[in-house]
């Protein structure tokens, strides 16, 4: 009887705020208490192999989940914070079940039609946020592998779009591809250096 009074809660997290290229990804997950999943720690603490295994388990066992994106064009038009909030709103709206409460990793919550709470380091403290963290990170890593196939000069499969020395050198040498975030200062600076050498 007590379970009838439990609130339906979704955990939400994002991946890809810091990279210089590719979309920002958000995931929302409502876990099924009758189908527990072990090891739902923050995705950054797990090996890629373990994350991949957990990704499949979450999709198989969750009561509901949705993975959503905000594109590079949206990031450049809105700014990365607003694009992240948009991706989160899309992930929550895409759930097949409407939660009564949404728990979000971090210190900000998007505008939502239900109660929400931002939880700093929530990916390590709240199981459903940990699950969302894994879905978002694995989905984005797979997108970066596809980006690498389309734009092999930049090494997206290795650095996942982050501003490594090799990535910045490739930006100077080859210019930006359509998936680079042109409003990000390292991209602008690399393109300015490339133009100066032209």
Curated annotation (Swiss-Prot):
<keyword id="KW-0614">Plasmid</keyword>
<dbReference type="GO" id="GO:0006298">
    <property type="term" value="P:mismatch repair"/>
</dbReference>
<dbReference type="GO" id="GO:0005737">
    <property type="term" value="C:cytoplasm"/>
</dbReference>
<comment type="similarity">
    <text>Belongs to the RNase HII family.</text>
</comment>
<protein>
    <recommendedName>
        <fullName>Ribonuclease HII 1</fullName>
        <ecNumber>3.1.26.4</ecNumber>
    </recommendedName>
</protein>
<dbReference type="GO" id="GO:0003723">
    <property type="term" value="F:RNA binding"/>
</dbReference>
<dbReference type="InterPro" id="IPR001352">
    <property type="entry name" value="RNase_HII/HIII"/>
</dbReference>
<keyword id="KW-0963">Cytoplasm</keyword>
<keyword id="KW-0479">Metal-binding</keyword>
<keyword id="KW-0255">Endonuclease</keyword>
<dbReference type="Pfam" id="PF01351">
    <property type="entry name" value="RNase_HII"/>
</dbReference>
<dbReference type="GO" id="GO:0032299">
    <property type="term" value="C:ribonuclease H2 complex"/>
</dbReference>
<dbReference type="GO" id="GO:0030145">
    <property type="term" value="F:manganese ion binding"/>
</dbReference>
<feature type="domain" description="RNase H type-2">
    <location>
        <begin position="7"/>
        <end position="196"/>
    </location>
</feature>
<dbReference type="InterPro" id="IPR022898">
    <property type="entry name" value="RNase_HII"/>
</dbReference>
<feature type="binding site">
    <location>
        <position position="13"/>
    </location>
    <ligand>
        <name>a divalent metal cation</name>
    </ligand>
</feature>
<feature type="binding site">
    <location>
        <position position="14"/>
    </location>
    <ligand>
        <name>a divalent metal cation</name>
    </ligand>
</feature>
<dbReference type="InterPro" id="IPR012337">
    <property type="entry name" value="RNaseH-like_sf"/>
</dbReference>
<keyword id="KW-0378">Hydrolase</keyword>
<dbReference type="GO" id="GO:0043137">
    <property type="term" value="P:DNA replication, removal of RNA primer"/>
</dbReference>
<dbReference type="GO" id="GO:0004523">
    <property type="term" value="F:RNA-DNA hybrid ribonuclease activity"/>
</dbReference>
<keyword id="KW-0464">Manganese</keyword>
<feature type="binding site">
    <location>
        <position position="105"/>
    </location>
    <ligand>
        <name>a divalent metal cation</name>
    </ligand>
</feature>
<dbReference type="InterPro" id="IPR036397">
    <property type="entry name" value="RNaseH_sf"/>
</dbReference>
<dbReference type="InterPro" id="IPR024567">
    <property type="entry name" value="RNase_HII/HIII_dom"/>
</dbReference>
<keyword id="KW-0540">Nuclease</keyword>
<comment type="function">
    <text>Endonuclease that specifically degrades the RNA of RNA-DNA hybrids.</text>
</comment>
């Amino acid at each position: 009887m007590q379970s009838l009074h439990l609130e339906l809660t979704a955990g939400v997290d994002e991946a890809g705020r810091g990279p210089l290229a590719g979309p920002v990804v958000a995931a929302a997950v409502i876990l099924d208490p009758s189908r527990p999943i072990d090891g739902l720690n923050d995705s950054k603490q797990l090996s890629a192999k373990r994350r991949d295994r957990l990704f499949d388990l979450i999709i198989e066992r969750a009561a509901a989940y949705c993975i959503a994106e905000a594109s590079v064009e949206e990031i450049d038009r809105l700014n990365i914070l607003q694009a992240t909030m948009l991706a989160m709103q899309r992930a929550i709206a895409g759930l097949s079940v409407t939660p009564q409460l949404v728990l979000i990793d971090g210190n900000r919550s998007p505008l939502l039609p239900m109660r929400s709470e931002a939880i700093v380091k929530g990916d390590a403290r709240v199981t459903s946020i940990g699950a969302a963290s894994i879905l978002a990170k694995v989905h984005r890593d797979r997108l970066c592998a596809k980006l690498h196939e389309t734009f092999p000069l930049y090494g997206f499969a290795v650095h996942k779009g982050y501003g490594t020395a090799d990535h910045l050198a490739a930006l100077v040498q080859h210019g930006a591809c359509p998936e680079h975030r042109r409003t990000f200062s390292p991209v602008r600076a690399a393109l300015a250096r490339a133009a100066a050498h032209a």
